[in-house]
């Protein structure tokens, strides 16, 4: 099922991006070791590579990916930061996912 593959790839891509950015954040804002930049760089390289695996136009992929990124960021907020999402966080995430689904899976005439 190509839809599940696409969503799964988006989820892994978002995790790579968020993890890489979070590691840089820890170094910059939390005074953690500079060595965190090594896995940070690897994670961000993986993020870019994963984005390149999608078989559709890059602009469409980037637009749709944003919806999945929002959901993953809210999950990160909850799991890593320990902050429970609000109802509005969840509603916004659902709307973002709907947007992703429309962009990626709507019938194409061209």
UniProtKB/Swiss-Prot annotation:
Pfam families xref list: UPF0060
Transmembrane segments: 7-27, 33-53, 63-83, 87-107
Subcellular localization: Cell inner membrane
InterPro entries listed in its UniProt record: UPF0060
Keywords: Cell inner membrane, Cell membrane, Membrane, Transmembrane, Transmembrane helix
Family according to the record: Belongs to the UPF0060 family.
NCBIfam families: PRK02237.1
Name of the protein described by the UniProt record: UPF0060 membrane protein Noc_2955
């Amino acid at each position: 099922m190509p839809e599940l593959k696409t969503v799964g790839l988006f989820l892994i891509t978002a995790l790579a991006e968020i993890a890489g950015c979070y590691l840089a954040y820890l170094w910059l804002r939390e005074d953690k070791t500079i060595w965190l930049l090594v896995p940070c760089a690897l994670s961000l390289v993986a993020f870019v590579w994963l984005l390149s695996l999608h078989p559709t136009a890059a602009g469409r992929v980037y637009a749709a990916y944003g919806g999945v990124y929002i959901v993953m960021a809210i999950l990160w907020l909850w799991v890593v930061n320990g902050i429970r999402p609000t109802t509005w966080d969840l509603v916004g995430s659902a709307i973002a996912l709907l947007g992703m689904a429309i962009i990626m899976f709507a019938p194409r005439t061209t």
